[in-house]
């Protein structure tokens, strides 16, 4: 099975789908939508392969002890690989959210939203990252 592509990459990389967040914002602005009215959506779930469910909540991703967390520095998002080095899950973490919030402030966007509350861990790691990133640029 093919490795899953990043579903919410901030920027393009070899592992992104057709669109990155940057591409989506640029397309909306090019179509005449005011950047100051745009809100960046941040998923609190990941996409997996046959070794993990296709959709996996962040709270379930962080307990996958058999996988190693990695970072795509071009796309600015994390992913997990198995012992053979194959990508198993693409997802968001506090670091990727911080980069997205920096981006939305640099672009002059209205803010961020996430989907969904219940997918976060018990500590609210991702919710707190969104709050800090949006409210404390």
Please name every model-derived segment:
Residues 1-65:
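Substrate-binding surface in catalytic domains of secreted glycosidases
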Residues 116-123:
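A short, acidic, flexible beta-alpha connecting loop/helix-capping segment that sits on the rim
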Residues 38-42, 110-115:
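Hydrophobic faces of well-ordered beta-strands that scaffold small-molecule active sites
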Residues 29, 105-108:
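Non-catalytic positions within long, well-ordered alpha-helices that form the structural scaffold/packing
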Residues 37-103, 123, 128-137:
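Glycan-binding loop/region signatures in secreted carbohydrate-active enzymes
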């Amino acid at each position: 099975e093919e490795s899953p592509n990043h579903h919410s990459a901030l920027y393009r990389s070899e592992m992104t789908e057709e669109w990155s967040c940057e591409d989506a914002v640029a397309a909306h602005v090019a179509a005449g939508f005011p950047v100051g009215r745009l809100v960046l959506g941040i998923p609190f779930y990941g996409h997996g392969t046959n070794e993990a469910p296709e959709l996996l909540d962040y709270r379930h991703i962080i307990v996958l002890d058999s996988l190693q967390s990695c970072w795509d520095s071009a796309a600015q998002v994390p992913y997990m690989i198995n012992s053979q080095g194959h990508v198993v899950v693409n997802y968001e973490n506090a670091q990727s959210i911080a980069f997205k919030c920096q981006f939305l402030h640099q672009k002059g966007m209205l803010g961020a939203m996430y989907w969904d509350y219940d997918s976060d861990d018990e500590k609210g790691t991702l919710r707190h990252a969104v709050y800090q990133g949006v409210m404390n640029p």
